[in-house]
Amino acid sequence: MSLYSPLAIFATNATKRILLFLLIFSSLTVIATTQQIIDKFASDPAFIPSSIGICITDVKTGETIASYNERQAIIPASTIKIITTATALRLYRPSFCLHTTVGHTGTIDETGTLHGDLVIHGGGDPSLGSTYRSRHTEDFIDQIIQRALSNHIKSIEGHIVVDDSLFDEPAISPKWMVEDIAWDYGTGCHAFSYKDNRIEINLRYNGKSYDVAGINPPNRFVVEASLTKGEKENITVQCENNRYTISGTIPKRKDRYRLYLSIARPDSLFITDLQEKFQTAGIEVRNSNLGQFPETTWFHYPSDYLGDIVHSLNVRSDNLYAESILRLLSLSAHEKGSAEKGIDIIRKYWQNYEADSLELFMYDGSGLARNNKVSAKYLNCVLKETARDALIGEYFVQTLPLAGKEGSVATFMKHGGLPGELRLKSGSMSDVHAYAGYYTTPQNRYAIVVMINNYTCTRAQLKQKISALLTQVLSKKE
């Protein structure tokens, strides 16, 4: 029989149809199996009262690998930082810097007296004097001192003035819980931030109660402690001006304990620090009230690169950094920064990428507000489209902490055994746990969102369940 006879051609075409059918059937079987894993996970008795949102997509093709209630908006906690940071890097790029401007009013006479004020304009840099910035915490103040000495200034007749007007009020979201704002993770967001807008309090057990063993920064605040040992941490903080009163219990196995509390006026702390440094340098600040004079700029002090700020933010889940970046977004279209305008920028931006704004209820940039809600599909869209960005996609992926090694996911899936690289931003608060990020293999990359509200198991048990889910789903992906 000729190779090109009608019968041979029919046989060849029939074979092709069978192979195509088997290929399609095989693919459908894999997809169904993956979806079945998700469905079985969601049917766990611990999730009977839960709200669950899951969406896993192939970044390259955009195909949805598996999903569950992907359009239901639920509380994301800190995974909402992905929306804040991805939008910022796409609008401003990783090499962008914020600037704090230093100058003075009036003139400097031949005796070295500045007849005016020293003026610092906050530029929205959350890393100024931060423990987590690339330069040491005193670098900004040291540069001011050096500039004053190079101008032969021996005294400043006026005040040290900090202009904090670039960001609109409120500094603290009205949606945040009152009990959160005393802690460093609930500190206010100002155009002029300094030393992470927080104080560090070190406590030592004396056999009956806890003594204050140290305060950083020192000699700036008064702390009164009435703390004893208990089953768990249960601490109440009251603050008035620079005086903190702390009461409650500390876990009984801890003889030393460290607390980080928010400060309401970072500008006041900075002025006190700078005045002290001026005094050491032999420069007197007289604090006289003077009239209005023209202003002369000395220098613009740059922040770390935005990309470095985002990496630090995502690995450490820093709320202050996130809130500052949210306000930075609004400056792309407005003269002053505000959270509300920043959120409006986010909504409009992602509408261009088929992210349905009806699935986003956003009230801050950090995720501290329990009113925040977002769908797994919306969050996945942000992940997917950002990873596809030719200019910043790979950079953004690397800003997320590596599961099993870094940040809040340092212990999550530590022994998962997945062949690829799993980078996840976690989010957690009372009755809320979530992960969002990427799984990357040499051949493919997948965007992953898993959010669960109101589970009835322990958080440790929930982490184990999610770990098992991701292991089953992702181990099938090469």
Segments (PLM) and residue ranges:
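Active-site-proximal alpha-helical segments within enzyme catalytic domains
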Residues: S78, I82-A88, I120-G123, Y244-G248, ...
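Residue-level signal for short segments within beta-strands and strand-turn junctions
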Residues: I56-D58, H104, T440, I452
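Beta-lactamase-like hydrolase cores
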Residues: V30-Q72, H99, I144-H152
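Conserved serine DD-peptidase/penicillin-binding transpeptidase domain
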Residues: F41, L91-S357, Q472-K476
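Bacterial Sec-dependent N-terminal signal peptides
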Residues: M1-Q36
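A generic structural motif
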Residues: Q72, P126, N454-T456
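Small-residue-rich helix-loop
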Residues: I65-S67, Y301, L326-E478
